[in-house]
C-alpha cells in the first residue's frame, strides 16, 4: 500500500469555546518520546513530523474520524482542552458536545464519550450529520454554535472533521486495493476503475 503521512490521515479537530465565543482549529497529531511521554499535540506537530529526533514517534490517534489509539487521543484532547479552555476546575469543564462527521457504530461513539469524560467534561452530548431540523445548506459551524440554544449548559464542543476529504478518499482506495489483492479479487477491483 502506498505510504500516507500522519498529516494526510489525521482528523481536523475544531474546539468551540461557548463561554468566550471562539473556535480553535487543531490537528489530530501527536509526538511521543519512545518512553511514552507526549512531547507535542496538535498543529504544532506538523512542522516537526519530518525532522523527528531518533527517540520519538509522530502519528495521528484519530484517523478517518475514528479513534485509532485511545490512550494517545485522550492525552491529546486533554492537552488541547487545557490549552484553550484553561485548567479544569474541581467539577471539570462542564457539559461538552462531540460532533463527528463520519458514520460511527456504537463502540466508536462510546470511545468519543469516554474521551470527553476523561478530558474533563462533566456531561457529554453526541451529535452528527443526522441532526434533525437543520435547514439544508446550513454550515456545520453554525449548527454547532446553535447547539447552545438546545443544550443551555454547553461549555465547549469538539468537532471531528476533515478539511481535505480527498486524503481520506485516496487512503480508502489504497486500503481497498490492498484488501482486494489479499482476497484474490484484483481482477474485480480493476473492473471498478474501467
Regions found by a protein language model. Give the residues of each.
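Nucleotide/phosphate-binding catalytic cleft detector across ATP-hydrolyzing
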Residues: 1-25, 32-37, 45-144, 150-194
